[in-house]
Design a protein with these regions (language model features):
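Alpha-helix-centered segments that form part of catalytic cores
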Residues: 340-366
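Short, well-ordered beta-strand elements within core beta-sheets of diverse protein domains
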Residues: 16-20, 133-140, 269-270, 384-385
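Short, well-ordered beta-strand elements
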Residues: 137, 378-387, 394-395
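Acyltransferase
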Residues: 194-218, 247-252, 278-299
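Gly/Ser-rich catalytic/binding loops embedded in alpha/beta enzyme cores
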Residues: 1-96, 205
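Short helix-loop capping/hinge segments that flank enzyme active sites or metal/cofactor-binding pockets
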Residues: 1-15, 174-179, 237-293, 306-309, ...
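A short helix-breaking turn/cap at a secondary-structure junction
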Residues: 113-203, 406-408
Length: 408
């Protein structure tokens, strides 16, 4: 999503847009075309990218290629399945809360979420989810990730988020020994599987053997529950704004029949959130960015699991009948109650993937690397997060780990 090509389908996983053809080509896709890439087609996502699995009703679930009883993840699940199954060596993807890194972890791929402002945006949208959503790709090799980042990066003056470009030298020169903090505790207090912990400790040992200074920490840099509550408020308001534009374009009001139930609930909740609350949570994101900048004065890198569990079974996050009934009547509740229901709607899937969203709020670069497979052959990645603008550190570490056969 956010990667439209003029004249080509762009449904965003929604029944509203099954016959829609993009009217213009996004700057991201223009850059790919300039670099000589051949665009094969579109891949599947959940409706409007709201989930960490890909199961849009108009397309059906996306299977994990090495276990078709499981989901490939989301929201860039179709892209991940394409690369993992060998159809393409890389696939464009977007990440608004882990949508590159989560399927990368499940599919044994490399998934980089670049710093906010690194990759071309517009002209249809310059501030996706207030900067939380960014574009990049899923790959199989660090070399491809480095080359793609170097050639795709931009200093885009019309964008609200602007970065100086990374030099070729900075992406190729040897890295000094880094200070790396690692933790395996969920930022929202949920369960983290033994496999996810084992993956993280394997990566920590490997990085230490490469000469880096690795320290286990117990305290989360940010308040994870508060951060996710702010994320859902943003998601709700941005969805309400999106449907306001859709209603204007179609000349009618939206109904539940136009969308999936989860989308309906998010849409309804966004219509009641006061503007002052939205302003406060965006200011809160700035404070999170400040807190992480202070954290990186002590540590160059934060290492965590990418996800808490291996890829989920199809239907694992099905909503209870009671919750579905509440969501159908979402408009009847005040906004605090609506947000409680949004939390309840997402909590099972959030427990599965609680580590990725914070980098979207702060704008930091973060990468998932494929370091572990469990006894069933299911992949789990680890996540490395650096200070804003320091993709070079992430990619140097990734390259070192790849060259030392840490990847699995």
């Amino acid at each position: 999503m956010g990667q439209e090509q003029a004249g080509e389908p762009s449904s965003a996983g929604s029944r509203l847009f099954t016959s829609y053809r993009a009217k213009e080509t996004d700057n991201y896709v223009k850059k790919l075309e300039e670099l000589g890439f051949i665009i094969l087609g579109r891949s599947s996502t959940p409706e409007f990218g709201f989930k960490n699995i890909s199961d849009a009703q108009i397309h059906g679930p996306v299977n994990l290629p090495n276990d078709v009883t499981r989901n490939a993840g989301g929201s860039s699940g179709g892209a991940a399945a394409l690369v993992s199954s060998g159809i393409s060596p890389l696939a464009p993807a977007s990440d608004g809360g882990g949508s590159i890194r989560i399927p990368a972890s499940f599919n044994g791929l490399i998934g980089l979420k670049p710093t906010r402002g690194r990759i071309p945006v517009g002209p249809s949208s310059f501030r996706g989810w207030q900067g939380a959503s960014v574009q990049f790709a899923l790959t199989k090799t660090v070399r491809d990730t480095i080359r793609l980042l170097y050639h795709m990066q931009t200093c885009q003056m019309e964008s609200p988020f602007i970065l100086p470009k990374l030099s070729k030298v900075s992406l190729e020169e040897a890295v000094r020994p880094l200070k790396i903090a690692f933790l395996t505790v969920s930022p929202i207090g949920g369960n983290v599987s033994e496999s996810a912990i084992a993956a993280t400790k394997k990566a920590a040992r490997a990085l230490e053997s490469l000469g880096h200074h690795v320290h286990e920490i117990s305290n989360q840099p940010l308040n994870g529950i508060e951060a996710m509550q702010s994320y859902y408020i943003m998601n709700s308001v941005e969805t309400a704004a999106m449907f306001d534009s859709i209603e204007a374009g179609l000349g009618r009001k939206m109904t539940l029949e136009d969308m999936e139930l989860m989308t309906w609930a998010i849409f309804q909740s966004g219509q009641k959130i006061p503007a002052k609350i939205y302003s406060k949570i965006l200011a809160q994101w700035d404070q999170y960015s400040h807190q992480m900048a202070k954290f990186h004065e002590s540590y160059d890198i934060l290492l965590t699991p990418t996800v808490a569990e291996v890829a989920p079974k199809h239907g694992q996050f099905a909503l209870s009948e009671n919750l579905q009934n509440h969501l159908k009547h979402m408009a009847d509740f005040d906004w605090p109650k609506q947000q409680e229901l949004i939390w309840e709607m997402f909590v099972d899937s959030l427990d599965w993937t609680p580590f990725t969203q914070q980098a979207n709020l702060t704008g930091q670069p973060s990468i998932s690397l494929p370091v572990y497979r469990d006894e069933q052959g299911l992949s789990l990645g680890v996540q490395l997060t650096a200070a804003k603008g320091r993709e070079d550190l992430l990619l140097h570490l990734a390259q070192q780990m790849e060259e030392c056969s840490v990847f699995s």
